[in-house]
Amino acid sequence: MRGLDYRWIEALDSVVSKGSFERAAEQLFISQSAVSQRIKQLEKYLAQPVLIREQPPRPTLVGKKLLGLYRRVCLIEQELVPELTNQEHVRPVSMSIATNADSLATWLLPALDKVMKSRQVELNLVIYGESRTLDKLKNGEVVGAISLEPQPITGCSAEYLGQMEYLCVASPEFYQKYFAKGVTPRSLIKAPAVSYDQYDELHNKFLWDYFAVLRDKVINHTVGSSEAFVRLALSGAAYCLIPRLQIISELESGALINMTPDFMLSYPIFWHHWQLETGVLLEISDAITAYAKSVLPQ
């Protein structure tokens, strides 16, 4: 019986990553019909579909598992072949990491700095909410993810990194305008706030846990940028929850004030990654774990 042909999965990967059969054909230097034929052969071999044929095409659950397998094999190949053939000039190892915006804006880039400077590596940092990054790892789209989930998924490891601490802050002028009589449920309902996106549960949790206020009762801007949170707070346009690490100088200078010194939101984060014990991924895992533990409260 003929085994699984990785050219079939390569075609699937190209269609999904490029978003169409046409662009996949251009990437693989074959005809569009050849791409389609390879995917049909893969589906015939597995006796089930691997691709949802819509625009853009999406992998089925089985397709996602195959892509995860294929990308692991590609990563191992990228590191092993140059070593076996003594190649001096090789293409950089390419890998994707899923991270929340706040980790990227505070500690993640310094953690990766040494590896990025010393190794031939191309990193694709995919930004998602910390409650959803693990889905990218489950689907095989990334090699590692910063997540709230402590339990590793099958074939992966998880390391505790530390606590992300959030402060509720605003400019002095904003505070005087909306909270001169204190931070209360009534004043919070009147004051504009900021959330990252519709999946951002951080602000919802803060409002409900400490003040029993529901999100739909407040004025809430949506801005998909951690840096924009700081700028909005500094400008006096809104108050928001921001990582303590991101605003140390602003707090020290008085440009921002901690609105609720008695309340601080804190949650643990974890680094999930494929179980590869050598190579660049191991270096990245060691760098992320060591740096995070040096700057995040444990």
From Swiss-Prot:
Entry's Gene Ontology molecular function annotations: DNA binding; DNA-binding transcription factor activity
Gene3D superfamilies listed in its UniProt record: 3.40.190.290, Winged helix-like DNA-binding domain superfamily/Winged helix DNA-binding domain
Segments traversing the membrane: none
Any Pfam family hit: HTH_1
Record's keyword annotation contains Transcription regulation: yes
InterPro entries named among the record's database cross-references: ArgP, ArgP_gammaproteobact, LTTR, LysR_subst-bd, Tscrpt_reg_HTH_LysR, WH-like_DNA-bd_sf, WH_DNA-bd_sf
Stretches assigned to the HTH lysR-type domain: 4-60
Keyword terms, alphabetized: DNA-binding, Transcription, Transcription regulation
Known role: Controls the transcription of genes involved in arginine and lysine metabolism.
Subunit-structure text: Homodimer.
NCBIfam families according to UniProt: argP, PRK03635.1, PRK13348.1
Protein family according to the UniProt entry: Belongs to the LysR transcriptional regulatory family.
PANTHER family: HTH-TYPE TRANSCRIPTIONAL REGULATOR ARGP (PTHR30579:SF2), TRANSCRIPTIONAL REGULATOR (PTHR30579)
Name of the featured protein: HTH-type transcriptional regulator ArgP
Lineage: Bacteria, Pseudomonadati, Pseudomonadota, Gammaproteobacteria, Vibrionales
Encoding gene per record: argP
